[in-house]
Amino acid sequence: PLQSPEETIDEIHDNAGIAIAAHPYCYYRSGLGNITQSLDVDAMETKNSRYILGISNYLSKKVSNKNNIPEIGASDAHFVEGIGCCYTEIPVTDSVDTLLKYIKKGKSTAHGKRTPMDLIIREVIRKKGHRTKPKEN
């Protein structure tokens, strides 16, 4: 069932997960925008490699810094070639629990670059093709 952001975050925390606001200022991908600032998120994606101008990354980084919300980076890859364009640097550990604690404590840093434009265009064309197919009854 569809849940509110608050309910989703509560469920994540109830299951020992960390709640990360993914591309919060990317409005064409359902980012939560300024609502993120009032949510109990554990981290915010401040570097997402699938962008055109980078405004959403800039705003995410600004809000993350202003509100002391830990940052992460993610490739958000839809093609193999896009994997690793953005990433999160975290101190080395063998423990998943420690890794999650590092993120929550802000010991993570987002790095990376934009996905190559030809991959972004290929994805847009692929999605457009799916949307134009007639619905089957």
Task: State each model region's role.
Residues 20-22:
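Acidic beta-strand-to-loop metal/phosphate-binding motif
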